[in-house]
């Protein structure tokens, strides 16, 4: 009797594990499909001809994706840790647009983009801002709301004390530049802001008062200077 019970428990555990694995595979397949469709829409809408592949990998696949020989630098890898912050398709488009921008830039220039890739590594702050702006353009052309880039970054990039010796810009600086870019080039989205009641957008408004005040002064004075956001 004891052997029978032990055997049944083992079988039940095996079956439950099988169902769990099936559920995980189905979930990954659905997420991958969503990422592929969103990525394809962005690339088609922006007439991007360079090949870029999208890969959804859970944390346990991270090392494999980095080391596999058939994985190139032109693959956009979306980890579960990134995807969990995506609240809607606009935010997914925000994430993918930035990564596509960086991947496409790696094709530019001589030596099949090798020099450009080295430049990006040498000036990460500069290209971080460039990618943010290109992402806004990509999103608008693909009929996505670029304000979602603000809400996504607000959630995923904690503010640091300073960026003097960092390879990344302060989050507040990035968001201020994105806001100014949208304000200047795509004012429709701010005038008809569907994210106005979004808690993360409200958080941005609260923490960006000084930077937005600088922008208002710039507009008031009809200035063309590049503001030194903090």
Where are these regions (language model features)?
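A secondary-structure boundary/capping signal
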Residues: 78-79, 96
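Substrate-binding clefts and substrate-entry loops adjacent to catalytic sites
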Residues: 106-126, 158-159
